[in-house]
Amino acid sequence: MYPGAGRPTYHKQQEQKGPYGQPQYQQQYAPPYPERYQQPYYQPPPHDGYSRPSMPPPSHNYAAAQYERPSCPPPGYAPHQGGFPAPGPPLQGRPRDLMRSDIQMNHSMDYSNIQGPASYTRPEFVAPPPQERQFLDPGNRSVEYQYSQCTGNRKALLIGINYFNSSAELRGCINDVQNIKNFLISRYGYREENMVILTDDQHDPVRIPTKANILRAMHWLVQGAQPNDSLFLHYSGHGGETEDLDGDEQDGKDSTLYPVDFETNGHIVDDEIHDILVKPLAPGVRLTALIDACHSGSALDLPYMYSTKGIIKEPNVWKDIGSNSMQAAMAYVTGNTGDMFTSLKSLASTVSRKATGSGGVDTERVRQTKFSPADVIMFSGSKDNQTSADAVENGVATGAMSYSFVKVMSQQPQQTYLSLLQNMRTELKGKYTQKPQLSCSHPLDVNLQFVL
């Protein structure tokens, strides 16, 4: 049964608001062995039953000629610098032969000789995730959750959309997918036959990242998941915002992802993604999501978001007002009228909600509604009110956040959740304004070891 059927979900609220309904599945989505790429990443595929977008996603109200991610390189940033590091120590044995004990060994390997750059945060002690069930309220043991040991089966869904031949075209998203795929296989024992890869340079129409294919693949990813399984979702492409209809967003906006056919079939909203990927998971199942897109801070609608100090971030309307004002001013100085008007519109909305009290979302109610006993972790490319950069590193187009994740984990594999967030921000600081975000389906001990 489709997750959320028979209870209030985003689909029922959106029945009159556009094409967000459940796709019509004719058969169960099975992951055939992905074909290897036989063409350059930037070569667009032939038309196979979908229409490439002729204009950019509408969520920012940009004119077609103004929509880029970003419209120009960051000030003071020269292209063709940096790059993905050479792979570090591989796992023992070939990835296809890895057993559960080998995967567990990778989580406890001694990486003391791989400290990473001096600028990185270096955890003094990294504790493994506890095996015991945890309780949301120690005084009330009725609500529990469980960390995953990540020693079971492993599946991955990797999505990269360049939006070829459109004014919304990106250059690094398909490269991101290839880099993440290679990283998961070489470091964490994922197998290519247990991956579904959707990119818009492929000939097989089943592998084009249309809305129906993405939703079908999301169902495949979580189907049959058991405690200690490790699931991985990576999305690199356009993101945006739309009006929040169920009152679970402090800023009044839902995060959205844009499939390649968004013009005809619409975007994918965070409530829908949460219904499919988070709600069905049992305690102890791990889903790690890496969302490299604009406005992606709440792309999975996870209720607990953490700061670089390791504490839960609470909504701050006055801080939002200051942030929107600064973004509008910077856009004015740089001549980016599209960004300026978007920031001013967001500022007006924030001030209005502060004045009327209409933005008073019941944070505790939202946390109870979006809480999951599973172990769902998301690193997103930016805050809900930020854009993410389509960057160039070492002469190769890439998403800035995807690049920082692979680089940090390759140069210093022994990370806590907190140090990983801090070090990813360190990698981007000075070159990009975006700030990667960390969120979770349950209260998270950010000083535990980050495992996959």
UniProtKB/Swiss-Prot annotation:
GO biological process, one term: protein quality control for misfolded or incompletely synthesized proteins
Region (Disordered): 1-97
InterPro entries: Caspase-like_dom_sf (IPR029030), Metacaspase (IPR050452), Pept_C14_caspase (IPR011600)
UniProt enzyme class: hydrolase
One Pfam family here: Peptidase_C14
E.C. numbers: 3.4.22.-
Active site, per annotation: H238, C294
Family designation: Belongs to the peptidase C14B family.
PANTHER family per the UniProt record, alphabetical: METACASPASE-1, METACASPASE-4
Protein's UniProt name: Metacaspase-1
Organism: Eremothecium gossypii (strain ATCC 10895 / CBS 109.51 / FGSC 9923 / NRRL Y-1056) (Yeast)
